[in-house]
Amino acid sequence: MKKIESHKLHGGDLQVWQHTSATTHTEMKFAIYLPPKAIAHETAETTETTGQRCAVLYWLSGLTCTEQNFIQKSGFAEYASRHNVIVVAPDTSPRGVDISGNDVPDDSAYDLGQGAGFYVNATQAPWATHFQMYDY
């Protein structure tokens, strides 16, 4: 996995990660917000090597969204920070090319193909190879 963004926000840390998914056979991204209590801290009195356990909320965006829509537009971080909630926002679908260099199927309709945001496993060609979003 590779961290591609990191931003301090309401005392916590908003990160975006990219990884190769064995489920979609593509590079996928997800955002994660770690509230202050989830982050390890060092003070003069103590050194915490791990943060505290926090509840986790998985946000699944809708049609035409990416992992960026929710984290940029919702204003969630203040609440998540105050209530010690880790928020995970995955991308909505595979995009671009797969790990073999083949194009991921797409469609000209906004509600089918890349960015469609259906969290189900496709069962028919050409979608079944990459669109396994329930499992992802």
Predicted regions and their residues:
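Non-catalytic cap/lid and distal C-terminal segments of serine-dependent acyl enzymes
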Residues: M1-Y136
